[in-house]
Each structure stands twice: as structure tokens, then as C-alpha cells.
């Protein structure tokens, strides 16, 4: 699996250390093992996990600005765990309301010795925002409108929302709450992944 990951990274033009590659493979191994009992993801094939979970997450890294991020509705740690591995200088709070997912995240944190993550079991509306975050990240969490409405207390004044989407969600963009606008839309290149992937970056208009 390490060779497969190395080929995918090369195709994506991403350079990682051997330690980072080993951490990503170890995470996939854990996800595959726990998935059999806890049903954490619908992807059953570890090689598919490399494409649809690992690469699909880390291609976002160059677009993130800041040092403190929160991954809302992280599930089994996506995209937060892969991002924390490739951006070790940043801190990621991983938020999910389901206990089984957070237990898995804590086990990953322990086994991979990830000191820059904090798994938290909470609903996003109930989670305090002190201190505020540089970025709020979501992948398959909610519509843009719901994401901004539920998470508006989390980012700093000049913070951003980062939403991973498939096709550009024009209908969701049109329904953004007042006071927010799209700063950029980046087409993400994920090797061997069928379908389009985009990162929508949303900013508050006061900044």
C-alpha cells in the first residue's frame, strides 16, 4: 500500500516525508480494521481509501491559510487526520457528535502519536469558539448555507470556511446567508478519482 500511495502522491505532485507516508498508511490500516466493526465509511477497499479519503483530503492543504482549524462533522477523521499529518505545524480540532467515531479518532491519535489534533464529541452548535479558528473545514457535512449558519460562531474575524464539494454547487452558493460570499473556488486534482472535486472558500463580507 505504501508503493500505491507513493505513486498517487507523485501523480498529484505532492512531496511528503517517509514518516508522513507511513502515518497515512497506518491510518488507512486502522480505518479498514475498525470499519469492519464500527461502519465508519462506506469505502471498504483500502486502496480505494487511499484515493477517496487520503488524496481527496490532502489536496486541500495548499489552500489553507492559518494555523488553527476545526473539521466539523469529521466522521472517521476526514479530512482532518490526513491534513494534520501533512501540515504538522497546524492544529486541528476534529468535531463529531457520534461517540464511536470520536473513540476511533482518539485511538488514531494515540497510535500515530498525533499531537496536533484534538478529537471532540459535540454537536457543532454547542461547541464553544474560544479561541476562534482560522478556518472551518467540512467534507460532505452540510449545504453551504447550513455550514455557515451552524458554524458562524467558530471562525476568527478574518477566518474562512473551506467546503469540499463535488461539482460546483451553484444552487447552494446562491443561497448563502447574507453577510457571506465566495472568495474562491478551486478545482482539485485527485489522481484516479472519478468525477469532479472542488474546494469552495467562503469569507465574511466585513473583511
Swiss-Prot record:
A molecular function GO annotation: rRNA (guanine-N7-)-methyltransferase activity
Cell compartment(s), UniProt: Cytoplasm
Documented EC number(s): 2.1.1.170
One Pfam family linked to the record: GidB
Catalytic activity of the protein: guanosine(527) in 16S rRNA + S-adenosyl-L-methionine = N(7)-methylguanosine(527) in 16S rRNA + S-adenosyl-L-homocysteine
GO cellular component terms, A-Z: cytosol
Binding site for S-adenosyl-L-methionine: 73, 78, 124-125, 139
Enzyme class: transferase
Keyword rRNA processing among UniProt keywords: yes
Assigned protein family: Belongs to the methyltransferase superfamily. RNA methyltransferase RsmG family.
Function: Specifically methylates the N7 position of guanine in position 527 of 16S rRNA.
Name this polypeptide is given: Ribosomal RNA small subunit methyltransferase G
Organism: Enterobacter sp. (strain 638)
